C-alpha cells in the first residue's frame, strides 16, 4: 500500500476542516478484544467503569497511572473519520488506526476543548486533556508522513490523530448515530 506524501496530506486540510462542529455522525465502531485484534460492530455499549464493553482498555496497563492501571481518561480513543479515510484509503483499513469510535466531527481543541461533553446515542462522553498522539503501529500502517502530519502544529490543534475520552453516562451507540456536542452552561 502506497502511503501519502506530506503534500498530499496537507492538500486535504480544507476538507478536514469542514467537519461538522456541533452535530456529526458515528461512522464506525471497533472493539479491540486483545492486542492487534479488531471487531467491527454495528452497536456497542459504553460504560462509565468499563469503557466500551468487551474492549481491552480495561486490561491495558498505563504508564500514566501510579499503579499502572488503565487510565480512566483514556477509556475511548476517537478519530475524525475524514482523517481516517485520508490515511487509510480503504474503509476496510480504518480499524487499523486502533481507535474505537470514528466520527465525522470537528475534534479540534477549539471546538472540543478538554471537558467538553458529547452525546452519542444514549451515552455521554467527556473529552480528556490527555493528547492522543499515535504509536509505531500507526507509522507502520499509514506511513511516517501521516504520523508527522497528525502530530504537526496544525495536526495537534485540529486533533487529527484523535482525542481521548471517558464515559460519563453509559448507553448504547450505533453506527449512524448522531454525535452531538452538548452546550456548556
At which residue positions do the language-model features occur?
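Metal-cofactor-dependent catalytic cores
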Residues: 1-185
